[in-house]
Amino acid sequence: MQRLWRFDLDGSNASLILPEIAPVGYHKWINESTVVMFVLGSPATLQVGDLETGQARILTEDIGRSIHNIPGTEDISYVQRHEDGSATIMRLPGRGGPPERISEAVSQGDFHAWTPDHFLLMTDGPLIFARRYEPGASWKQIADFSDLHLNLSRLAVSPDGAQIALVAELDALELPAN
């Protein structure tokens, strides 16, 4: 069962964090005592855990598999799925308050990432899209990997913003008939 654990950097002093919460798929820290977790299930939930009280609360259900710290803030972003198949990227204020809408997701996408200079990135099949983190900004295609026959999913940006790592699956190629 996937759970959150805390260790010293040398691997010693292992301790289970929030033992009642499992299975934890992804997590991000707001501060030293508050963690936001993607908890697997049907549906998956977004939970906020307080290490001081040992309690967690469900914030919302049916979220995407991508949660991130928003650069330069204590805020967290996540993808909220909707019954009609659409999805919205949401911001959870780190200092409290209700979630707020950032933008509609690209093509019902699950995966997003942030650059250090506040660009939001999303994948859609072989494409990568970007938009500024500001009201009224729109998505713009910035890369196309169609020639490589890749179906992109997860992405991560290096802390300095100089590199992007991608998880991709090779599309099934149609072979010519004999």
Which residues does each predicted region cover?
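Sequence signature of WD/YWTD-type beta-propeller architectures
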Residues: 1-178
